[in-house]
């Protein structure tokens, strides 16, 4: 039997598994079955806690989408990861250092129960996002063949450990997230696919955001997407250093001191239930 915990960060939900004290392996087919909301446990991502590869770190953090693919980053998942390892007694520190497939992260458990995550320095160089463009720009033109014909979108592109494309919209509630997101997420200029954010700027300290996630469709919240949107908005001169991001599942606070500096995200992480499955 494998023990797991169901958690969520603003409705972005996870199956979290301790791979430190348990010997676990999940095939892509198993993950797809477990992610099914009718016949499985149901989740956006599976989070796996593994022993560190570096003695200076506490854990290795792996993320698998509902379609079974492994991805580089998940900000909401990182907050749940921190709460999980502390509550399960895997660590007794407030500050936790982890590695992911895209780098290293610092997670900090706050007194009010929220978690602050150092999401790293936003990557703007196109080849490292990866995004096919000659040079880094604040705004790119992205052409897509829509059912009604060729359409051009203005977007920002950034990596937060995973690739993001951010579009500004006038009214996020009425944005065609499913249709546009499902096309742009596989756009040829993003060789590894892309998460697509739809951002409405309320004022310099407040945005509303919906995200179509690569491999998972639209979710109630996307932490790395919130960070990407704030980075793009700030680079375009529309946002301040501290921004409240309202997502369908709730709000996050993002702090960024500007280019070349790490971006910090603070938000909740909630325990739902503990369970076990047969391997």
Swiss-Prot record:
<feature type="binding site">
    <location>
        <position position="65"/>
    </location>
    <ligand>
        <name>substrate</name>
    </ligand>
</feature>
<feature type="binding site">
    <location>
        <position position="195"/>
    </location>
    <ligand>
        <name>substrate</name>
    </ligand>
</feature>
<feature type="active site" description="Proton acceptor">
    <location>
        <position position="222"/>
    </location>
</feature>
<feature type="site" description="Important for dimerization">
    <location>
        <position position="273"/>
    </location>
</feature>
<feature type="binding site">
    <location>
        <begin position="75"/>
        <end position="76"/>
    </location>
    <ligand>
        <name>substrate</name>
    </ligand>
</feature>
<keyword id="KW-0028">Amino-acid biosynthesis</keyword>
<dbReference type="GO" id="GO:0008837">
    <property type="term" value="F:diaminopimelate epimerase activity"/>
</dbReference>
<comment type="function">
    <text>Catalyzes the stereoinversion of LL-2,6-diaminopimelate (L,L-DAP) to meso-diaminopimelate (meso-DAP), a precursor of L-lysine and an essential component of the bacterial peptidoglycan.</text>
</comment>
<feature type="binding site">
    <location>
        <position position="162"/>
    </location>
    <ligand>
        <name>substrate</name>
    </ligand>
</feature>
<feature type="active site" description="Proton donor">
    <location>
        <position position="74"/>
    </location>
</feature>
<feature type="site" description="Could be important to modulate the pK values of the two catalytic cysteine residues">
    <location>
        <position position="164"/>
    </location>
</feature>
<feature type="binding site">
    <location>
        <begin position="213"/>
        <end position="214"/>
    </location>
    <ligand>
        <name>substrate</name>
    </ligand>
</feature>
<feature type="site" description="Could be important to modulate the pK values of the two catalytic cysteine residues">
    <location>
        <position position="213"/>
    </location>
</feature>
<keyword id="KW-0457">Lysine biosynthesis</keyword>
<feature type="binding site">
    <location>
        <position position="12"/>
    </location>
    <ligand>
        <name>substrate</name>
    </ligand>
</feature>
<comment type="pathway">
    <text>Amino-acid biosynthesis; L-lysine biosynthesis via DAP pathway; DL-2,6-diaminopimelate from LL-2,6-diaminopimelate: step 1/1.</text>
</comment>
<comment type="subunit">
    <text>Homodimer.</text>
</comment>
<feature type="binding site">
    <location>
        <begin position="223"/>
        <end position="224"/>
    </location>
    <ligand>
        <name>substrate</name>
    </ligand>
</feature>
<keyword id="KW-0963">Cytoplasm</keyword>
<feature type="binding site">
    <location>
        <position position="45"/>
    </location>
    <ligand>
        <name>substrate</name>
    </ligand>
</feature>
<keyword id="KW-0413">Isomerase</keyword>
<dbReference type="InterPro" id="IPR001653">
    <property type="entry name" value="DAP_epimerase_DapF"/>
</dbReference>
<dbReference type="InterPro" id="IPR018510">
    <property type="entry name" value="DAP_epimerase_AS"/>
</dbReference>
<dbReference type="Pfam" id="PF01678">
    <property type="entry name" value="DAP_epimerase"/>
</dbReference>
<comment type="similarity">
    <text>Belongs to the diaminopimelate epimerase family.</text>
</comment>
<dbReference type="GO" id="GO:0005829">
    <property type="term" value="C:cytosol"/>
</dbReference>
<dbReference type="GO" id="GO:0009089">
    <property type="term" value="P:lysine biosynthetic process via diaminopimelate"/>
</dbReference>
<protein>
    <recommendedName>
        <fullName>Diaminopimelate epimerase</fullName>
        <ecNumber>5.1.1.7</ecNumber>
    </recommendedName>
</protein>
């Amino acid at each position: 039997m494998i023990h797991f915990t169901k958690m969520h960060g603003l409705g972005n939900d996870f199956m979290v598994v301790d791979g430190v004290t348990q010997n676990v392996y999940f095939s892509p087919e198993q993950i797809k079955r477990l992610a099914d909301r009718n016949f499985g446990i149901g989740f956006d991502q599976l989070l796996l806690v593994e022993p560190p590869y570096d003695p200076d770190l506490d854990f290795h953090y792996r993320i698998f989408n509902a379609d079974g693919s492994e991805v580089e980053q998940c900000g909401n998942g990182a907050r749940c990861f921190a709460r999980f390892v502390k509550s399960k007694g895997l660590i007794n520190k407030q500050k936790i250092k982890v590695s992911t497939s895209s780098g290293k992260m610092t997670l900090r458990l706050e007194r009010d129960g929220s978690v602050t995550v150092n999401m790293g320095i936003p990557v703007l160089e196109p080849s490292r996002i990866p995004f096919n463009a000659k040079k880094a720009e604040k705004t790119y033109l992205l052409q897509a063949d829509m059912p009604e014909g060729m359409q051009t979108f203005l977007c920002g592109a950034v990596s937060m450990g995973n690739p993001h494309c951010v579009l500004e919209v006038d009214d996020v509630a009425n944005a065609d997230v499913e249709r546009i997101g499902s096309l742009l997420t596989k756009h040829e200029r993003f060789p590894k696919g892309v998460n697509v954010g739809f951002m409405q700027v309320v004022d310099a300290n407040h945005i509303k955001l919906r995200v179509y996630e690569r491999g998972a469709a639209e979710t109630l919240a996307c932490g790395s997407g919130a960070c990407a949107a704030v980075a793009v908005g700030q680079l375009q001169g529309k946002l301040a250093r501290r921004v409240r991001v309202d997502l369908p599942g709730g709000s996050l606070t993002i702090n960024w001191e500007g280019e070349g500096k790490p971006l910090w995200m603070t938000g909740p992480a909630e325990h739902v239930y503990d369970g076990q499955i047969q391997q």
